[in-house]
């Protein structure tokens, strides 16, 4: 009996040592989750500035705070993290844009409003988790995103293909709430403001909407 107990004790120690040796470092492992997990909602307010293909060669002021090219905006987004590093987000933003070539005068704001919305599907990369490993108690996260979608001018009743990209930084202020700042660009086909453009190359006929945004993220579970 004593020999049997000794053999069982030795086997137990050996198995424990083996399990300890093969335990992976979960900090950098890739883990997926159920469909109901890790959803989030975001609401934000932004300042956006428009740079169109039609203004090329007219020497207009480039400041993003000029009245003829900038306006405030709002946004709403819903998304899900599929792994700690990769997620998807559907983002709707607008409402007040500008048609920069309205009268070629950078001293007036009259007549160049362009109400719009942009709907994008974006892939999000959590760079903090990607390069430093996942930590549940991390306060600050840095992310990047890129995507595509569609924009619509409600003023001119036109649609335009849209590409988007940017950086996103968030700070956890409660268990399920974070404050974020985001800087990004939406680059539209030229007909987002009902203009034809002046360049031969299609990439030069695009209207670019740069924005800086602040908002809140609510984690749903």
Residue positions per predicted region:
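Bacterial Sec-dependent N-terminal signal peptides
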Residues: 1-23
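Outer-membrane beta-barrel biogenesis signature
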Residues: 18-42, 127-142, 220-221
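Short glycine/proline- and aromatic-enriched beta-strand/turn motifs that initiate or cap beta-hairpins
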Residues: 20-77
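Residues that define the transmembrane beta-barrel architecture of outer-membrane proteins
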Residues: 37, 68-74, 113-119, 140, ...
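Residues on the lipid-exposed face of transmembrane beta-strands in outer-membrane beta-barrel proteins
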Residues: 43-45, 76-80, 121-127, 146-150, ...
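Predominantly the C-terminal beta-signal and adjacent terminal strand-loop region
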Residues: 97-103, 174-221
